[in-house]
Amino acid sequence: MNATTQAPLDGRSARWAQHREQRRAELLDVARHLIHDRGPDVTMEDIAAASGTSKSIVYRYFSDKAQLQQELGRSILATMHRRLLQELEDLEAGGATPGAPERIHAMIRAYVETAERSPGVYRFIIRPSDGLNHFLDSVSRLIATFLPDSVPAPQMWAHGAVGFVEGSVDAWMTQQETHASDPTTPAPLDADDVVTHLTSWLMKGMHP
């Protein structure tokens, strides 16, 4: 009897868990698009309205804005991971063996393109909070796994590199925003130049 009644309960639990994850993913997608369109200052009320639901429902899936930030950061990180794998696979398919310069260039490009593709979302996930710390730590771990074996203390190097790149990209984006509102200010570098310079600087730091 217990086995007979347990199976339907387990089935309902599994369906509910699946529904919850699906709804959570939908809300996260709505939040991403809203932040992309309106910028990082959107509220949980804004997200609820765009989702056609109430704020209390949103809080069932995300306990607070910091958790939303962390989940969105995790989603962005997964996209960066896929881009890195694809770029390295493309290099290998072309007959190249990615060394330190190619790997670091690919990692920086993935980061810069993430910021450039959606400045609002990028600004949202790097706002000071536990969510930011989680995102940057996750990026550091991701980078460390892609570094060549020749790099000493890869975790330490990755943490330092991420801090350097994050600060540099933030300054670059601020310059973009300033120039957009006041064209008389110095024009910012384009994304390709940013990637090239950051790669060069980090490579010099790796081999002083």
How would you name each of these model-derived features?
Residues 93-98, 177-189:
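Intrinsically disordered, low-complexity terminal tails and inter-domain linkers enriched
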Residues 52-62:
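Short hydrophobic/aromatic patch on the recognition helix
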Residues 126-170, 189-196, 200-203:
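Amphipathic alpha-helical packing segments from all-alpha helical-bundle domains
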Residues 71, 85-120, 157, 161, ...:
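Hydrophobic alpha-helical connector segments
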Residues 22, 35, 66-79, 83, ...:
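Alpha-helical DNA-contacting segments of helix-turn-helix folds
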Residues 43, 122-126, 181:
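Short, hydrophobic secondary-structure boundary micro-motifs
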Residues 1-41, 45-49, 67-70:
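Basic, helix-initiating cap at the start of DNA-binding domains
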